[in-house]
Amino acid sequence: MYNAVGIDVSKGKSTVAVLRPGGTVIRKTFDVSHTSQNLNELADYLSSLDGTTKIVMECTGRYHEPMVKALSEAGLFISIVNPHLIKNFGNNSLRKVKSDPADARKIARYTLDNWTELRQYSGMDNTRTQLKTLNSQFSFFMKQKVAAKANLIALLDNTYPGVNKLFDSPTREDGSEKWVDYAYSFWHADCVRKIGLKAFTERYMSFCKKHHYIFQQDRPEKLFNASKELVAVFPKEKTYKLLIQQSIQQLNLASEHVERFRREMNELASTLPEYSTVMGIYGVGKTYGPQLIAEIGDVSRFTHREALTAFAGVGPGVDESGQHKSKSNRASKVGSARHCFRS
């Protein structure tokens, strides 16, 4: 005996429909609030049903996660499916009905029709959910970092033009950059050229020692001579110093968050079985690899490469009818923009 449970998830509550083969209704469609008590009661009810029970719900952002957590911990079979599959399922009625109970029943019918192909939610899916959340936060702080850096450069162009191009040292593991550290100490061109070469050399040596940079004997003279040719629009005043140093602090904080998320994502992704395969792709590194895994999910559910292309939403559509046969079609736009591998 099969029990097909369709759950239409929304924010704070879900609508549940329970069907058996032949369209037999086990219980009238009902709503469940996303509270601990109500979710536990739902889990107890579904566990008490005679026969084999499978539960299907759509992947709707983060709204489905409380339901998934409660039912998976109860040992029930849960499958999370792409909403587009449900949308295109069973559209054989002239009457269009859009309501939570109707959607829940539609998901339950989908469960019955695809009973043997349903893929069960696993612990690995929880890891992938964590990875996707980290990737979202990584992207958020990366945007903040880019904005903070652009703002800082705009300010420095008025006090120490071109300071961001003085050094080509790579970004450190903590996200710090040499030119940013240098600009914090020497925020204005007058901080260099007005104190004389000898005094600047001593200050630059102290700067390198403090931040653990290699001191080069000829570097202070080059920096000193270059500063003489610069035109500073803003005067060397306390207000501009405060603005620049606060901007640097904001940039360093965003950079620290970015690097922390980058490390955490790589560590988490390395626990997944597909990690070595993805990292073996040419051009994929410790940043792009975990991002691919986060947005693609479990690659084992794709039986061929066209399935992955369709999931990403970048597959070319088919335009054929009668004698017409298009040879050049636009890529489809179905699915999340993140699945197009843009981060």
Sequence positions of predicted segments:
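A detector of single, family-specific signature residues
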Residues: 1-343
